[in-house]
C-alpha cells in the first residue's frame, strides 16, 4: 500500500463480523451494521505535543482494534476500502 498516515493518524482495514448469532441465526446483509473492529495497516510516527516533542503511538501495524461506529474517514485505495482515524478514536486493542 502506498499510504503513509501523518502524526497520530492510523489506517485501518475493517474486519468482518460474525455472519451468525450465538443461537445459529444467520444475519442478512441488509441487517448488518458496519464492523467496529479492524486491523491497523499503517500508523503515523506519533502525536506532536504542545512542547514540540513527539509521543509515540500506543498502537502499531498489525494490531486489532475496536473503534466507534462512525469514527474516521472512509477512503478507497487500490480498490480496498479503508478508514483513516486519529489514535484518540480507537477505544481498545484486542489482545491475542
From Swiss-Prot:
Main location: cytoplasm
Known partners and oligomeric status: Heptamer of 7 subunits arranged in a ring. Interacts with the chaperonin GroEL.
Function: Together with the chaperonin GroEL, plays an essential role in assisting protein folding. The GroEL-GroES system forms a nano-cage that allows encapsulation of the non-native substrate proteins and provides a physical environment optimized to promote and accelerate protein folding. GroES binds to the apical surface of the GroEL ring, thereby capping the opening of the GroEL channel.
Coiled coil: none
GO cellular component, one term: cytoplasm
Cellular localization per UniProt: Cytoplasm
An individual GO BP term: chaperone cofactor-dependent protein refolding
SMART domains cross-referenced by the UniProt entry: Cpn10
CDD domains: cpn10
Keywords annotated in UniProt: Chaperone, Cytoplasm
Family in the record: Belongs to the GroES chaperonin family.
Domain of life where this protein originates: Bacteria
Name used for this protein in its record: Co-chaperonin GroES
Gene that encodes the chain: groES
InterPro entries assigned to the protein according to its UniProt record, in alphabetical order: Chaperonin_GroES, Chaperonin_GroES_sf, Chaprnonin_Cpn10_CS, GroES-like_sf
Molecular-function GO terms, alphabetical: ATP binding; metal ion binding; protein folding chaperone; protein-folding chaperone binding; unfolded protein binding
